[in-house]
Amino acid sequence: CEYGPSTKPEIHPMVTSILRHFFRNGHKVYVVCLWPDGQFMAEEALDEVAVDEFGLTYGTDYVLLGFRPGNEAVVKGIVSDIRKLYTIDSRGTKVTDIPMMEGINKFEDFDFLFSGSAGFPGSIEWVQFASDPTGVPMSTGTTSIQVNEVMPYVQSGQVQGILAGMPGAAEYEALIGVKGIGTSGMDAQSVAHLVIVLFIVLGNVGYFIERSRKKKDRGY
């Protein structure tokens, strides 16, 4: 997880939808965080989906390894030897005592990567230092601002797909058939856009009425 409270409205709906999709299909989920705030975001998403919705077991169905400082150095460490970088998880449990960590030693032991990214370090570092060198496929969800930075990697095939901002989150919610924050956020955004357009129209009407009145007052 590479996002925090300020970008939660865009990224969090993507992350919860991805988790629903993964768990629905029986996949085990391993979560690491390149941002300190990302750990809190991940805990909230996992509690909401893994615990409350699916009733899954920590350490067997999902694990939160947590945050480590170092930016792209953390990504490189995960690629080469994840057990050297993560000796304990976010709860302080030794990784050797976590059932689903059995057989997990390096990045190539994973089947797929999804990066919920709001900037640096994030999706670009994952593709450059993990996915591309190892061949493990990845996709990403980013803020609307970051889309243009990541799109070249999508177009080249290095990233399998991208969820672009709140519209992307809403589209993915529709895809998996579970409407959530992304959909309601887009509804609110659409209403706000309509209100703005209405004010522009009213402003223009008022301007032309006033101009017409002034012309009449001047006698032409």
Question: Language model features by range: what are they?
Answer:
Residues 141-220:
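C-terminal functional extensions of proteins
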